[in-house]
A protein has these predicted regions:
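Conserved pre-motif I regulatory segment
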Residues: 1-44
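Generic secondary-structure boundary/loop-capping signal
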Residues: 3, 33, 54-57, 82, ...
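Conserved nucleic-acid-binding Ia/Ib motif block in the N-terminal RecA-like helicase ATPase lobe
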Residues: 5, 10-21, 69-127
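Gly/Ser/Thr-rich beta-alpha loop segments that engage phosphate groups in nucleotides
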Residues: 22, 40, 50-52, 111-112
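Walker A/P-loop NTP-binding motif
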Residues: 29-41, 52-70, 87, 92-96
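The conserved Walker
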Residues: 45-49
Length: 127
């Protein structure tokens, strides 16, 4: 199924296509419409099946559609079990949100916390 058929905005579809994807995977086709509709979802799929895009794309779209207001605050929080996965998920969010005003910040252990705190005070999506 094409990403535009899932209810994603033109700018998100463009960002996805610039990353080399034209068709959604089964997990994306099932998850994206449900998340966009505001439904809760618990999903599992094998490695490499597009799970990150399955939740990242609707999160980005929903945040883009919200009134941002004048106060900067955390809008979404994504938790991962490892620093490596946090970095990978963060990288994907940044690629997909390239046409938005969202600020995406990776936060994880093993590095100086002061810079991360500064970024947290300015950002909107964290993990």
């Amino acid at each position: 199924m094409k990403f535009i058929e899932l209810g994603l905005s033109d700018s998100l579809v463009s960002a996805v296509e610039k990353n080399g994807y034209t068709e959604s995977t089964p997990i994306q086709a099932q998850a994206i419409p449900k998340i966009l509709a505001g439904k809760n979802l618990l999903a599992a799929a094998e490695t490499g099946t597009g799970k990150t895009a399955a939740f990242a794309l609707p999160i980005i779209q929903k945040l883009n559609n919200q009134n941002q207001g004048k106060y900067k605050r955390i809008k979404a929080l994504v938790l991962t079990p490892t620093r490596e996965l946090a970095s990978q998920v963060g990288s994907n969010f940044k690629k997909y949100a390239r046409h938005s005003n969202l600020r995406i910040v990776d936060v994880y252990g093993g590095v100086k916390i002061s810079q991360q705190i500064k970024q947290l005070r300015m950002g909107q999506i964290y993990w």
